[in-house]
Swiss-Prot record:
<comment type="similarity">
    <text>Belongs to the glycosyl hydrolase 10 (cellulase F) family.</text>
</comment>
<comment type="function">
    <text>Has xylanase activity. Seems to be involved in the release of sugars from the hemicellulolytic fraction in the compost.</text>
</comment>
<keyword id="KW-0858">Xylan degradation</keyword>
<keyword id="KW-0964">Secreted</keyword>
<dbReference type="GO" id="GO:0031176">
    <property type="term" value="F:endo-1,4-beta-xylanase activity"/>
</dbReference>
<protein>
    <recommendedName>
        <fullName>Endo-1,4-beta-xylanase</fullName>
        <ecNumber>3.2.1.8</ecNumber>
    </recommendedName>
</protein>
<dbReference type="InterPro" id="IPR001000">
    <property type="entry name" value="GH10_dom"/>
</dbReference>
<feature type="signal peptide">
    <location>
        <begin position="1"/>
        <end position="17"/>
    </location>
</feature>
<dbReference type="GO" id="GO:0005576">
    <property type="term" value="C:extracellular region"/>
</dbReference>
<keyword id="KW-0326">Glycosidase</keyword>
<dbReference type="InterPro" id="IPR044846">
    <property type="entry name" value="GH10"/>
</dbReference>
<feature type="active site" description="Nucleophile">
    <location>
        <position position="252"/>
    </location>
</feature>
<dbReference type="GO" id="GO:0045493">
    <property type="term" value="P:xylan catabolic process"/>
</dbReference>
<comment type="pathway">
    <text>Glycan degradation; xylan degradation.</text>
</comment>
<keyword id="KW-0119">Carbohydrate metabolism</keyword>
<keyword id="KW-0378">Hydrolase</keyword>
<feature type="active site" description="Proton donor">
    <location>
        <position position="147"/>
    </location>
</feature>
Length: 333
């Protein structure tokens, strides 16, 4: 049966294939998307979200973060995360956990607790262990540590770093490994698409963790990008990460533009999506690409970047934009 399926995939013309189908044909594990609980009441959206020919991997955008899962110390709630996980599992889609430790979307008890070093490390250990254990056996990968760097490659002065230095990173990774030995453990960050100080900081961190025998399986490259400004070194930088012996994944891809939308901007966006996909395709250890939701209807961009938007491959009416064809071309050319 599997041989027949593979042969059919091999002979299908590109025009009949969809994004995940083409990613698998290119040797990748998946093409996927983030989603979030509020949009799961939108039936047309949910129908396309479950189209595994386009999306065979799902990331919960917010419902597995610290404020959603441990709102008060030692009290865990997983209901919204379970909704996303169960939906994906029922459809046979891979799951990416997001995220164990992040400086943002923390409950007040973490940010204002004024814990000492050992207490805060114990809190990190317990949170990561409990969260990852709850989803043991369900996740392909976890963003264990999210956005630990400043733009210059130094470590972000988060509540965790201020009290523990980099010790919280190793603590989180070890807790996650013990909680689920078979999930892939990632460090995830933005503005590490091209070479530069921040990417060098990531490389140095991963090397240091490896030298300390701290488990680290992958680097997540968020790829929140701008139309016409894709780093020319993106493929080389993905390869630099891969040369560390870890997986690489593009984890939160969107490519925003200054509004209003024009045909010229849409065509440039199509080319930019193609460029990003081709970079992943060219790097054997780049295992897949996830868009940060697939439709402009639910994009985070307009709420954060004033006057910008239209970042996703589908528009607000759930119609494919030229960017969709850019992804198709990136996998198939």
């Amino acid at each position: 049966m599997y041989l027949v399926a593979f042969m059919l995939l091999a002979i299908l013309p590109t025009g009949y294939c969809q994004l995940n189908t083409l990613a698998v044909r290119a040797g990748k594990k998946y093409f996927g998307t983030a989603t979030d609980n509020p949009e799961l009441g939108d039936a047309p959206y949910v129908a396309q979200l479950g189209n595994t020919a386009d999306f065979n991997q799902i990331t919960a955008g917010n419902s597995m973060k610290w404020d959603a899962t441990e709102p008060s110390r030692g009290t865990f709630t997983f209901s919204n995360g379970d909704t996303v996980a169960n939906m994906a599992r029922n459809r046979g889609q891979l799951l990416r956990g997001h995220t164990c430790v992040w400086h943002s979307q923390l409950p007040n008890w973490v940010t204002s607790g004024n814990f000492d070093n050992s207490t805060l490390l114990s809190i990190v250990q317990n949170h990561c262990s409990t969260l990852v254990s709850h989803y043991r056996g369900q996740m392909y990968s976890w963003d264990v540590v999210n956005e630990p760097f400043n733009e210059d490659g130094s470590f972000r002065q988060s509540v965790f770093f201020q009290k523990t230095g980099t010790a919280y990173i190793a603590t989180a990774l070890r807790a996650a490994r013990n909680a689920d030995p078979n999930t892939k453990l990632y460090i995830n960050d933005f503005n590490i698409e091209g070479t530069g100080a921040k990417s060098t900081g990531m490389i140095n961190l991963v090397r240091s963790l490896q030298q300390q025998n701290v488990p680290i399986d992958g680097i997540g490259v968020q790829a929140h990008l701008i139309v016409g400004q894709i780093p020319s070194s993106i493929q080389q930088n993905l390869q630099n990460f891969a040369n560390l012996g870890v997986e690489v994944a593009i984890t939160e891809l969107d490519i925003r533009m200054t509004l209003p939308v024009t045909q010229q901007k849409l065509e440039q966006q199509q080319e930019d999506y193609r460029t990003v996909i081709r970079a992943c395709k060219a790097v054997s250890r780049c295992v897949g690409v996830t868009v940060w939701d697939w439709t402009d209807r639910y994009s985070w961009v307009p709420g954060v970047f004033n006057g910008e938007g239209a970042a996703c491959p589908w528009d607000e009416n759930l119609a494919k934009k030229p960017a969709y064809q850019g992804i198709v071309d990136g996998w198939s050319q």
